[in-house]
Amino acid sequence: SDGGAGGGGSSNLLTGTCPSSPFISNDSNLGGNTLCAIVGPITSDLTLTTDVMYRLSGLVDVGVDMGGDGTKSGGVAATLTIPAGVTLAQKTPDDYIVVQRGSKIVANGTRSEPIRFTAASAIDGSLTNPDSAIGLWGGIVILGKAPINKCSNDVRGTAACERVVEGSTTAIMGGASPDDDSGVLNFVRVEYAGKEIFPGNELNGITFGGVGYGTKVD
């Protein structure tokens, strides 16, 4: 992913107020912009605003795993909606987001106003190697209930065919719904992401696991 523009000059600073939500807290000032921390798990629908910047505060789960058939006990479905032009600027490799099975991310950017997941250092001007920097924050993991092939033949294609996704030690993917809908990603830029969980298991910029064809990515 490319580095892109920084936080911008004073003419386009985002100095609004953090939304009132149990999943958002005041963080700090970032390059003159108001920074609001998103805290998980997000257990009801949340829509971000466009007059501030955000960061993922550690692991942010969207929803609680609904299972391969959407009926898992304790599961909670939630939708995170990110409007066009919003920037999420993470501070550490431990900042990442997991959209659990049965939940959605609706990130509808546009060509002129993309949604940007980046590093805080790219906003405040402290990033020294923008052309080669990686691993400054975790990434995006999207999990669905669509069939996967990494299980035994006797359960393949059923809701019991599930496994832990790469980039995690606990997040589960898979199910029996080919048309499963995990949301929308349109004009979303992911910069400076990636994290090694342990050797051979790492987060990438965007990880899809068991995502069905109802999910829209453009």
Residues of each region from the PLM?
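Beta-strand/loop edge motif enriched in small/polar residues
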Residues: 1-218
